[in-house]
Structures are given as structure tokens and as C-alpha cells.
């Protein structure tokens, strides 16, 4: 449970963890505050004669036993208890400061998995054992989240005057040219391509939205007209909106095509400004006024304004000498948007700078930032009631947007990072690779039954990057990768590559280093990125962007989240629900833009949305996800929105549906306490600006939810949960390495393969054929050994035997007269003694080869992840630069088959030996014997709740591999 994973050094109670981390609206505890055991908190003001604590009162007080007062005054105190309580206050303050200090240190340093598991174990030991603590944590978490959801729902109901949904819909969807405000709030618009955005109180934000075309506002638009003048012309107003938007796409295309004919004639330094403000000599029949009108319309359409903040976009003056075409124009715009996310506010003052080549791997940027047109290009939805027309336009817009962003990434993937400012490389020929929108490739499932595995060679292209499905992640295909060559300057690229460890899409023949030509390494890095995402989404996205697996634009990340397998849908929701980071909010907007909710009931549209994104967790994140969904639903169904007085009603109703689904299908809610139809209707009374939602609508929603739960589609965690249910029987609890007592299914854990082997207690003694049969479940970080417990016609159950962490594991082969297909697993953690974990014998050589290949690759993946974690911490705390690709090439050569030699591991960890040992606290080193460098063998994982049973095999025979 998340509430048990506390990184503080001082263990705390579960209630402390919950209250300190999650309770909203509660003032944080003051460091100078009084203690809980100090009665009446002591009057902290100056003592006056009239005060109950004035010295006059002390003359009449008598001290009783233990310093308690015996006088008549209930508020009178003696001096001695005051000193005692003051000492208690100071002690409490010191403890609180220690807790805060340890929390700040733990947040800045990422502990290894075994240290995190050790912290959880210590909490469990302190508060009554594993079962008691986990049950308490689960109860607290469920109750607190339900309380927060209910409180947020009541807050949203009571604050309808805020009109947050109306404001966001009008501002962020100006491309619709359609206002959901009432007749009394609609103001004049300049229909010839210009638009006036209106706030909730009727005041104008500006006569024209600031855009690239400069200030084209009309003085007549500065003052709003009386609302009575427009109350009689609403129909005409909406018709004008519709006509304008229907012709908007064609006007934009014509304008772009005409501008692209003579884009080379405009000086590079003035390209962006001239494109929007100056007429071109070859516009053939298009006068200046019409061009300005269409330019203003185009700017209004593509500009995204959030929370009523209007800021001018960054000047796009880095046009360069690129081919004059519509594609170049799109690249310029999308490149500027990408630059806004990844640049650290550096100004480019050179004409030959290509903004689309910038790819700084930081997912965060300073808060004082300018908001530019970072929403997808050409996302135009007309306000037509026809769902067919809207769906068709939405699909075409999505294709245009995807193509534009993929073109803008051509230079980014082929150019490595440059210097501290991430400046683009100079002197590189700008070649446009042919990137086509490609539907997601169906991924093969890989479940090796009895050691057999079905593999298929995969040829990767674009951003597929050896993506694995939820079961198989170790397809070791060495086929040639179809990559696009971004530059012909190999020497400059290789020189830049040495300064930053990353992946660049180059043809196989253009690299001399075998690390780049090894498809196994490439796929391993991709899986590591998935694992990091499933642990910490922001860190995983940054890792994948750094290595070129994911475009560094909101649209590219949105496509990755929707199309790729191996991502936890729970973590997708965590990433998209993050309100603190602008990039996450933009990715969420792009994700919902890819979904079409036209002609769908609200609950069915919400079902489609939740199928891709798990809507649960903290109430604030759930609110953010539902808000984005409601916005998109209003865009896709303007006819439905007209039925309500306020678009906020859609948001409130969607939030109520989530509460209904949680209440109806939560196992913690008793059947007699589940929400009834009348309760559901009662909760939604008066939410539509004082009016009730039609009862028939609410009844239909309630019945559909009652018949069918809102569920999230299966991911790789679903299969791990199925395996967890199959493992039954006694699971010993109480030792350091627990059994499968509670949780095996975690967001980052996926099933690699399953096979049948035979355990060998003594390799020097024969045993009967088929004796000690074991069913092996190999996960990406754990090896679980089970035995068949019961067989039925349609199901098999397994009893748990042993489990081993893959970190520090070595896979060896042995053969003798008794066991021709022997497999030996040893612990090879640096600095620790080599320990034989277990011996197996495979039924045949083919099964042995397939199992050992998968196991070695999984071990190498775990080793690489731990190495990446240590390097990241060294960079963060000590400023140590990661080793270059050339320095790591020898290590990666050895780890290509999944086996790292003992000396290689020692060398990799000895690089930071000059630093403090605390800086490399990557393990339970401090808990092992004194004088030993390295970490002791963590033969089980607390995180997976697996029992480790000590096994002492006899002396191993001579290995012959």
C-alpha cells in the first residue's frame, strides 16, 4: 500500500502518514506549535493583571502531588508543570523537525528497492505485523479517498457560480467558434476571421487574442455592446459561427498554400512575422484584408489559452533556409511549440538555427513561462450537430496533427544534445525523412508453456523500438532496424554522442560501435523506460525521450500512452492527472483530443475514456481527468450541451457517475449501504444552475452503471494478478524475506515466461525422472518457484516454494551423467560471497536455452536499471557525469547476453568508491557484516511479498558450460 511506503528514517504510525501527507484544508503543523499533551496549549500572550494566568493568581494556588494544582481555579497552573510541558513541547518540535529533515532527504534521494522494502518491513513490525498493517492501510486509504471524493463533489456542487467549465470550454476551444454561454453573456464578434473571447462576468479579455499576427484589434471592439442588442439575434449569431467555421479549414489551407509559394523570398530573420503580416506578391486574387482576416482566424484557432491567462507567444524568428512548402510551415510552428517545452528560455539570434532540432531532455521548466500555441495543429471541430461530420473532421484533423508533429521531429531524433543550453548542431544538412503515420502494430503474446516459447523476428521502424507486450519483453531479434537517416555527417554525430548517453535513429551501417547495432540493447533500454514509467511516470517519460523512443511533444507522448503496450493504465492516470506540470496537462489535452465521443451518452463516453485511463487515486487527480473528459465531451456533443443551462453540469454529472460506480462496485461498501436510485437523483438536485437534470436521463445512467461496471482495459498487471490468484496454499510469514502473503501484482511487474523444470537438491546424486517438478514463473524482476497444488479440468493451482530477486543473479550451465541439462543460479552481488541459490534440470536442451536466454536478459535489465539509478543519484547529488558511450561499450558487450562478470560488476560500482558510502547507498550494505563492500544477497523481494527459504546445497561439481 502506498501509505506504508514512507521514506523517512523515523517510522511513524499509519494515521500520522495519512494525516501528514493527504488531508486537505488542514493547516500544516507549526514547528513552534504546542504539544498535544500541554493542556489548553498555554496562553502565549503577555500576562496582564486581569489574565487568568497573572502572578496574582499564583499566590492562591497550592501544589499537589506530581505538581498538579489543587486550587479552585481550573485554568491556574504552577511553574513546575510549565517547565515540564515546555520540555515536552521542545521535544516534540525536535522530533517534528527530524521527521521533516528525513523526509526532505529521502525525497531528494531515491533508495534502492530492497531499502524501500526494508522500510516497509520495519513499519509492519512496529505496528502489529504484515496482515494487520496492510489491512489498516487499505482501510485508511479507501476511506480517505472516498471522503475526499465526496468532499470535492459537494464543493463542486456548491460553487456553481465559479463557472470553471464554461470558462475553459470557451477559451480552450475557440477553434469551435461556438459559445456555450447564455444569451445574456454573448458579446459581439468580428466575424471576418477575428474573434473576441469573453470572460464569465461579461468583460472582454481583449478585442483580439494576441497571436503571431500582432495587434490587429479594432477600436470598436474595445467596449462590449449591451446584452439586450444580442438577445434577439442569437440564432443569427450561431448561424454566422457555423458558416465561419465550416469555411475555416479551406481558408487556412488556401492561405498556407499561397504563402508557401514565396516563402523563400522572405528574409530568414523576418520569416515568421512576414508570414502573418505582409502580403506575398504571388497571392493571385487575394487582397491584403482577406489575408489578414484568415491569418487572424488561423491564429485564434491554434492559440491555446489556459485559465484566462493571455501571454504573447514566443517570436518564431528561427525559420532558417528550409524548403518552402506547407510542411516547412508546419515544422516551424510545431518546432516552436516543442522548443517552448524543452528550452530553458534561451533566445536564438541566428538565422540558421533549426528550432525543431532542439531536444533537451528535461521535463520541467521554470514557472514564469510564456504560453504559446502548444496544442496540436489543425484541430478544428465545427459546431455542427451532425456527429458523422464532426467525427470525420476530427479524424482528418488528427491525421494532419500527427503528420505535422512527426515531421517536426525529424531533426530532433537525429541530432544529439548540444552543450548546456541544448543548442542545435550547426552545419548539418537538413534532410526530411519520410515519416508516415503508422497504426500500432499488434504485439505478439509470449507465454512459454513447459519451457517452450514462440518468437517472431520483428523489424522496428519509427518509434516502435522493440516494444513488448505485457507478457514477453525479451524477444532477442537481431534483424536490421529500419531507421531513417537524419544526417549524413556521421563524425559530428559521433562526437556529440560521446558527450551524452542517448539513442539516435541512424542506419545500422552508419555506426562502428556495436552497442548501436545491437538490437538486444535497444530493446532492453526500451523495456527499462517502461519499467521506470510504471514506477515513476515522469522519470520514465524523460528516459524514453532522452533515448529517442518517444517524441518530446505532447502529441507524441499522447500517442505513445494510447498505442503502446507494457504501460500500466494506473500510472497513465497518475501521469495525466498531475496538475503541477504544464507538460502533463498538455499531454492530457492531446489524449482526450484523440478520442471521439460524438453521439454517445455521457456514461458511455466516460466508459470509453476510462477504458484507456484508470480514473482512480487522489481526488485532485480524478477531478483533473474528469474535467478534461468533460471538455472534450462538450466539444464533441454541442447539441447535448445546449440542453443544459450551464456546461458545468456535464462535469458535475460525470463526477457523480464516477462516485456511483465506485460506491456500487467497491467491496468495502456493504450491500445495504450502496447508493440507491433515489440517492443518486437526490445528490444531483439543482446542479444545473438551480434546475434539475431530467429524471429520465439519471435513471438511464443509473441502470447502465448497475448492469455494467466502468472498467479499465487489461494491461500487463492484469496477467500478474491472474497468476497471483493461482498461487494458493500456506505462505509462511515472519522471516526477513516474506512469502506471497499479500501483493505480487505491482504496476512495474510483468510476466516474462512460465516453464516447467526439475529441482536438483544434489547434483552429484541421481533422482527419479519427474521428481521435484517445479513450475517456474519468471517476472521482469523476480523468479518465483512453485509446485502444482491441485489440478482440475479447467484450472490449475500452485503452492509457493521459493522466490529469488534477479538483481545480482548469475545463470550458469552444468552437465554430468545424471543431469545433462543442468541450470545453476548463483548470487553474484559485488562484494558479497558467491552463493548457490538453486539447481534445476531442464527436460531438453531447447527448453534450457529458451529459459536461460529469457532469464539472462531479465537479469541484465535489472542490473542496468540499478546502474541507471545510481548514476542518476550521483549526477543529482555529486554532479558526477554519466560515463560516455565509449566507456560503457565494453560493459554493454559483456551484458549483451544478460550475464555480467563479477569483475565487471565490481568495476562498475567501484567508480564511485571515492565518494561517501551514503551517496552510493544502493542496498542493505549497512545491514550486512562489517568490512564487506557491496550489498548482501537479497534473495527475496518484500515488494512482491515472497518467502525465501534457505537452501544449502552440497559442494557444486565442476562446471562445464
Curated annotation (Swiss-Prot):
InterPro entries: IQSEC_PH, PH-like_dom_sf, Sec7_C_sf, Sec7_dom, Sec7_dom_sf
Coiled coil: 846-877
A Gene Ontology BP annotation from the UniProt entry: regulation of postsynaptic neurotransmitter receptor internalization
Domain IQ: residue ranges: 133-162
CDD domains: PH_IQSEC (cd13318), Sec7 (cd00171)
Biased composition (Low complexity): 469-487
Primary residence: cytoplasm
Domain SEC7: 515-708
Chain residue ranges for the region called Disordered: 21-113, 263-291, 310-332, 347-515, 920-961
Modified-residue entries (Phosphotyrosine), positions: 909
Free-text note on domains in this protein's UniProt record: The PH domain mediates interaction with lipid membranes that contain phosphatidylinositol-4,5-bisphosphate, but does not bind membranes that lack phosphatidylinositol-4,5-bisphosphate.
Subunit note: Interacts with ARF1 and ARF6. Interacts with GRIA2; the interaction is required for ARF6 activation.
The protein's name: IQ motif and SEC7 domain-containing protein 1
Organism classification: Eukaryota, Metazoa, Chordata, Craniata, Vertebrata
Amino acid at each position: 500500500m502506498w501509505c506504508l511506503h514512507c521514506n523517512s528514517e523515523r517510522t511513524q504510525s499509519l494515521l500520522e502518514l495519512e494525516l501528514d501527507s493527504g488531508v486537505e484544508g488542514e493547516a500544516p503543523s507549526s514547528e513552534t506549535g504546542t504539544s498535544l499533551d500541554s493542556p489548553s496549549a498555554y496562553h502565549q500572550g503577555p500576562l496582564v493583571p486581569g489574565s487568568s494566568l497573572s502572578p496574582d493568581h499564583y499566590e492562591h494556588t497550592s501544589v499537589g502531588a506530581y505538581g498538579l494544582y489543587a486550587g479552585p481555579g481550573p485554568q491556574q497552573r504552577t511553574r513546575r508543570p510549565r517547565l515540564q510541558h515546555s520540555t515536552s513541547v521542545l521535544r516534540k518540535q525536535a522530533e517534528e523537525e527530524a521527521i521533516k529533515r528525513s523526509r526532505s532527504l529521502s525525497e531528494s534521494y531515491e533508495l534502492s528497492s530492497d531499502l524501500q522494502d526494508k522500510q516497509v518491513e520495519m513499519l509492519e513490525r512496529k505496528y502489529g505485523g504484515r496482515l494487520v498493517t496492510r489491512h489498516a492501510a487499505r482501510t485508511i486509504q479507501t476511506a480517505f479517498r472516498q471522503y475526499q471524493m465526496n468532499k470535492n463533489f459537494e464543493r463542486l456542487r456548491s460553487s456553481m457560480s465559479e463557472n470553471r467549465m464554461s470558462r475553459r470550454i470557451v477559451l480552450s476551444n475557440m477553434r469551435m467558434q461556438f459559445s456555450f454561454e447564455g444569451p445574456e453573456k454573448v458579446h459581439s464578434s468580428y466575424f471576418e476571421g477575428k474573434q473576441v473571447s469573453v470572460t464569465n462576468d461579461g468583460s472582454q479579455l481583449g478585442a483580439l487574442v494576441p497571436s503571431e499576427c500582432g495587434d490587429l484589434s479594432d477600436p470598436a471592439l474595445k467596449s462590449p455592446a449591451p446584452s439586450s442588442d444580442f438577445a434577439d439575434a442569437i440564432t443569427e449569431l450561431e448561424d454566422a459561427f457555423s458558416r465561419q467555421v465550416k469555411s475555416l479549414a479551406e481558408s487556412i489551407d488556401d492561405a498556407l498554400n499561397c504563402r508557401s509559394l514565396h516563402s523563400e523570398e522572405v528574409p530568414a530573420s523576418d520569416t515568421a512575422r512576414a508570414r502573418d503580416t505582409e502580403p506575398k506578391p504571388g497571392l493571385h486574387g487575394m487582397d491584403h484584408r482577406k489575408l489578414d482576416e484568415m491569418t487572424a482566424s488561423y491564429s485564434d484557432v491554434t492559440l491555446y489559452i489556459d485559465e484566462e491567462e493571455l501571454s504573447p507567444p514566443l517570436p518564431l524568428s528561427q525559420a532558417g533556409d528550409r524548403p518552402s512548402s506547407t510542411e516547412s510551415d508546419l515544422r516551424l510552428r510545431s518546432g516552436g511549440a516543442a522548443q517552448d517545452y524543452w528550452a530553458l528560455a534561451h533566445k536564438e539570434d541566428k538565422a540558421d538555427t533549426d528550432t525543431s532540432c532542439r531536444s533537451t531532455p528535461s521535463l520541467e521548466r521554470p514557472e514564469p513561462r510564456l504560453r504559446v500555441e502548444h496544442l496540436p495543429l489543425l484541430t478544428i471541430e465545427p459546431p455542427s450537430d451532425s456527429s458523422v461530420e464532426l467525427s470525420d473532421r476530427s479524424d482528418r484533423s488528427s491525421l494532419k496533427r500527427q503528420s505535422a508533429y512527426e515531421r517536426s521531429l525529424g531533426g530532433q531524433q537525429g541530432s544529439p544534445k548540444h552543450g548546456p543550453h541544448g543548442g542545435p548542431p550547426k552545419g548539418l544538412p537538413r534532410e526530411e525523412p519520410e515519416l508516415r503515420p503508422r497504426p500500432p502494430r499488434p504485439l505478439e503474446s509470449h507465454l512459454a508453456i513447459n519451457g517452450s516459447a514462440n518468437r517472431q523476428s520483428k523489424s522496428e521502424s519509427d518509434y516502435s523500438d522493440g516494444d513488448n507486450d505485457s507478457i514477453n519483453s525479451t524477444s532477442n531479434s537481431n534483424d536490421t532496424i529500419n531507421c531513417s537517416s537524419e544526417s549524413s555527417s556521421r563524425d559530428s554525430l559521433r562526437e556529440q554522442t560521446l558527450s551524452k548517453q542517448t539513442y539516435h535513429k541512424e542506419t545500422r551501417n552508419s555506426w562502428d560501435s556495436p552497442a548501436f547495432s545491437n538490437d538486444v540493447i535497444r530493446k532492453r533500454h526500451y523495456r527499462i523506460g517502461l519499467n521506470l514509467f510504471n514506477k515513476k511516470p515522469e522519470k520514465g517519460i524523460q528516459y524514453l525521450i532522452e533515448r529517442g523512443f518517444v517524441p518530446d511533444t505532447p502529441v507524441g507522448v499522447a500517442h505513445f500512452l494510447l498505442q503502446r503496450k507494457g504501460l500500466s493504465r494506473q500510472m497513465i492516470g497518475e501521469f495525466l492527472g498531475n496538475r503541477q506540470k504544464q507538460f502533463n496537462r498538455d499531454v492530457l489535452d492531446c489524449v482526450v483530443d484523440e478520442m471521439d465521443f460524438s453521439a454517445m451518452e455521457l456514461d458511455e463516453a466516460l466508459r470509453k475514456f476510462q477504458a484507456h485511463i484508470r480514473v482512480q487515486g487522489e481526488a485532485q487527480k480524478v477531478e483533473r481527468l474528469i474535467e478534461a473528459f468533460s471538455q472534450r465531451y462538450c466539444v464533441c456533443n454541442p447539441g447535448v450541451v445546449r440542453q443544459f443551462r450551464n456546461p458545468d453540469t456535464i462535469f458535475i454529472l460525470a463526477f457523480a457517475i464516477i462516485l456511483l460506480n465506485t460506491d456500487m462496485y467497491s467491496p468495502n461498501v456493504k450491500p445495504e449501504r450502496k447508493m440507491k436510485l433515489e440517492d443518486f437523483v437526490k445528490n444531483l438536485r439543482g446542479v444545473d444552475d438551480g434546475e434539475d437534470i431530467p429524471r429520465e436521463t439519471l435513471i438511464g445512467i443509473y441502470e447502465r452503471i448497475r448492469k455494467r461496471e466502468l472498467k479499465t482495459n487489461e494491461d500487463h498487471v492484469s496477467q500478474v494478478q491472474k497468476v497471483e490468484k493461482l498461487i494458493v496454499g500456506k505462505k509462511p510469514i515472519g522471516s526477513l524475506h516474506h512469502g506471497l502473503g499479500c501483493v505480487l501484482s505491482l504496476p512495474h511487474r510483468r510476466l516474462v515466461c512460465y516453464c516447467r523444470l526439475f529441482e536438483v537438491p544434489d547434483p552429484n546424486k541421481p533422482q527419479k525422472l519427474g521428481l521435484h517438478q517445479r513450475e517456474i514463473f519468471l517476472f521482469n524482476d523476480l523468479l518465483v518457484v512453485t509446485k502444482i497444488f491441485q489440478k482440475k479440468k479447467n484450472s490449475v493451482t500452485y503452492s509457493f516454494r521459493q522466490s529469488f530477486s534477479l538483481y545480482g543473479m548469475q545463470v550458469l550451465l552444468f552437465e554430468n551423467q545424471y543431469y545433462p541439462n543442468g541450470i545453476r543460479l548463483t548470487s553474484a552481488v559485488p562484494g558479497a560471497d558467491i552463493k548457490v541459490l538453486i539447481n534445476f534440470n531442464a527436460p531438453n536442451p531447447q527448453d534450457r536455452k529458451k529459459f536461460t536466454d529469457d532469464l539472462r536478459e531479465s537479469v541484465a535489465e535489472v542490473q542496468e536499471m540499478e546502474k541507471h539509478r545510481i548514476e542518476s543519484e550521483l549526477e543529482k547529488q555529486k554532479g558526477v557525469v554519466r560515463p560516455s558511450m565509449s566507456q560503457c561499450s565494453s560493459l554493454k558487450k559483456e551484458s549483451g547476453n544478460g550475464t555480467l562478470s563479477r569483475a565487471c560488476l565490481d568495476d562498475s560500482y567501484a567508480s564511485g568508491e571515492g565518494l561517501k558510502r551514503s551517496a552510493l547507498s544502493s542496498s542493505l550494505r549497512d545491514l550486512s557484516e562489517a568490512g564487506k563492500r557491496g550489498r548482501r544477497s537479497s534473495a527475496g523481494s518484500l515488494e512482491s511479498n515472497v518467502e525465501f527459504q534457505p537452501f544449502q546445497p552440497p559442494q557444486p561439481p565442476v562446471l562445464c558450460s
